[in-house]
């Protein structure tokens, strides 16, 4: 995958959860809402997790009830509902996670550049900051 995100893969995973809510348990072992690139997909996934935690059905009506129309346009939910569910969901989930980690690494690269030129920070402080951020990424992706 050349890119650090795929809207179609995100849509397919959300569609699979909608059509087979039992899949959410496996997905939750790998993904967090922040792993989704599209803000609307993050929000929809958050709502799915909340519904699951509240022992409520994960379906279109309950999702719409909990979504704020300012956050997610109905057309996005319709695109998810019209997407074909996938059979090997975990392979798609791993692609989303991989892209998420790469985006975090790209952000860290920007942070490294800023920290490296920060005059008020010693080299050891800069290293500690960078190592801390890298550690967060590595433990979150495991």
Residue ranges of model-derived segments:
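Interdomain "pre-motor" coupling segment immediately N-terminal to P-loop NTPase/helicase cores
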Residues: 84-142
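Noncatalytic partner-interaction/assembly domains of nucleic-acid and motor enzyme complexes
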Residues: 1-99
């Amino acid at each position: 995958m050349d890119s650090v995100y795929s809207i179609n893969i995100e849509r397919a995973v959300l569609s699979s959860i909608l059509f087979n809510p039992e899949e959410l348990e496996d997905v939750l072992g790998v993904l967090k809402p922040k792993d989704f690139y599209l803000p609307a997909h993050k929000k929809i996934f958050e709502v799915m997790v909340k519904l699951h935690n509240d022992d409520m059905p994960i379906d279109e009506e309950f999702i719409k009830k909990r979504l704020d129309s300012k956050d997610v346009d109905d057309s996005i939910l319709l695109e998810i509902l019209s997407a074909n569910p996938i059979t090997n969901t975990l392979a798609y989930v791993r692609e989303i996670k991989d892209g998420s980690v790469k985006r975090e690494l790209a952000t860290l690269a920007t942070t490294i550049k800023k920290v490296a030129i920060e005059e008020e920070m010693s080299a050891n402080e800069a290293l500690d900051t960078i190592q801390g951020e890298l550690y967060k990424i590595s433990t979150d992706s495991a």
